[in-house]
């Protein structure tokens, strides 16, 4: 589990050649309003896959990607904007994932673009 503000990013083995990424609220009794954009590039031909969750309340497990290939076959990005349920302030981060050797070498990098702002 990787804490991302008021959300938790969960990373699990998906199959023999993939990992699974999901989000949940750190406190499931306090859902978090979020905007999520996921982009993946995978395979030898560079297939592109995108997913958008706009203005979505996240409390329990929300799957972001069921199949992230873990043999150096996929570049994976998540742009995540979330509103703190207690302060109503917004934060945004980018999460980059790259997984190799059947998940034995998985790197997840988090960069915060801003925290504690209003719109």
What are these regions (language model features)?
Residues 1-119:
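Extracellular jelly-roll beta-sandwich "head" domains, especially the C-terminal globular C1q domain
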